[in-house]
Amino acid sequence: MSARLKVVHVGKFYPPYPGGMESHLATLCGELVDDVDLRVIVAHDGRETVSETVDGVPVLRIGTAAWISSATVNPGMAAAIRGSGADVVHLHHPNPTGVLSYLASGSRAPLVVTYHSDIVRQRVLRTLFWPVQHRFLRRAHAIIASSPDYAASSPVLRRHADRVRVIPFGIRPDDAGTPDPATVAMLRERYGARVVLAVGRLVYYKGFDYLVRAMDSVDGHLVIVGDGPMHRELERLAAEQGIAGRVTLAGRVDSVASHYAAADVFALPATARSEAFGLVQLEAMAAGLPVVNTQIPSGVPFVSRDGQTGLTVPPRDPAALAAALTRLLDDVGLRTRLGRAARERVSTEFSAERMARDTLALYHEAAGRPMPAIPTSRPE
């Protein structure tokens, strides 16, 4: 029997550090750790380098010497990649620090890249990084896109279309945790019987300002779980519209699962391609919630399909958002049917097990090794 592949993941950060890329990386590595010799190399938000094991996954957090805008400077990362002895390097992008460290490492291991999103808003960084990014992507054996929609709409991925493989992101059934019945009952009593839930960082591309405006004409209570720089702006907007009593900015919560269980409808009113996939949609769908999302050129409307698992409306359109939310809140039969289909779609199309299996096959292809037989289900 041949030795297991040694796979090194290079990311930005790793949980408990929050973020969509970080959540995906943890889910994927949690599924792969029994099938490959796995190690994760990421930045540490402190100056020291820390080696630890997180939920069975070996993680090396390289000390940060400085920050340039939102990017870290980690002088030890290139040496860590070079000394890893990897059979395959899997880098999660956009990640300027990881890309520069990989190129500086001189690694000759086959490269797999998960392309989480384009660099959208940081125009200076995008311009300066453009030639380096394409040099890096030309080195890749394969570039994973999370949806066919994003692969088709990204100018970067179109330039490297011959290397692009679509492997949708997946989740485990318990990724959001387990709802606590007492907490669910308390939330229902607090917010009432018509609850619209949104989850995410309070940043511009989530479109939460349009969602707050929409609630002016929706009979229901909006709960937004998450924090970020737009908190005060959203509070002010709700107050100006006279609906502060029906809009709750909950911040970070102990039990996201309980909030999903207490909600009737989930909303992701994204306005920009920075929202490349919308993993929170999967969590909501797994909880049996129909989704109201937006028709943006990314994976968002691919995850939850209009008329199948929810309703899709134009971006930046509070009236359309309000109409879709009201339709679902008023029609329990439609809400139940779409929610049931949403749960089934996650189970069949977006499982973490399926994502890991397809990724593992790609590793073996890149390394030129045959794919071993993998049990169809893992023992408990």
Which residue stretches match the model-derived regions?
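N-terminal strand-loop element at the rim of the active site
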Residues: 5, 9-19, 23-70
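A conserved mid-protein helix/loop that constitutes part of the nucleotide-sugar donor-binding site
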Residues: 23, 27, 194-217, 229-235, ...
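Short His-centered aromatic/hydrophobic patch
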Residues: 91-98
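A short, active-site helix/loop in glycosyltransferases that binds the activated sugar's phosphate group
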Residues: 138-176
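Acidic donor-binding loop of glycosyltransferase active sites
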Residues: 141, 246, 261-276, 289
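Active-site donor-binding acidic/aromatic loop of nucleotide-activated sugar
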Residues: 230-233, 244-253, 259, 311-312
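Short hydrophobic beta-strand element within catalytic cores of glycosyltransferases
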Residues: 290-294, 304
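Conserved acidic donor-binding segment of nucleotide-sugar-dependent glycosyltransferases
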Residues: 305-307, 311-318, 326-333
